[in-house]
Amino acid sequence: MVLNKKITILQVLPDLNSGGVERGTLEVNKYLASKGHRTLVVSNGGRMVRELKSDKGEHFKLGVGKKNLFVIFTVFKLINFIKKNKIDIVHARSRLPAWVCFFAINFINKNNSPIFI
């Protein structure tokens, strides 16, 4: 399949410190950015943010991996973030971020909601 349209992809994970999920996030970011797509990552930050940005990725700090009652507010922040940035695809890379993304996407109008993987 050939994509002529440039898309905006959001990857969501708890943090960008070290590990397989984090490395995979950077690899996907690098590949998609090299093809001209806009890639965004939402996490609580970490030492790999600099590498992400050097590969043309954009990072936004949001505590999507924190297990507490305030995660409800994170859902609403993510809804606004997705709408504002016109996200086409959301890729959740961990369990808690997946639930946060699931609830956020279900609050968005079905005609405007991104693909969730």
Feature locations, PLM:
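Short hydrophobic/charged patches on amphipathic alpha-helices used for structural packing
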Residues: 75-79
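Active-site proximal beta-strand in glycosyltransferases
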Residues: 9, 105-117
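Glycine-rich phosphate-binding loop signature in dinucleotide/nucleotide-binding domains
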Residues: 81-88
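Short His-centered aromatic/hydrophobic patch
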Residues: 92-98
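Short, flexible hinge/linker loops that cap or flank conserved catalytic cores
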Residues: 2-3
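N-terminal strand-loop element at the rim of the active site
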Residues: 6-7, 11-73
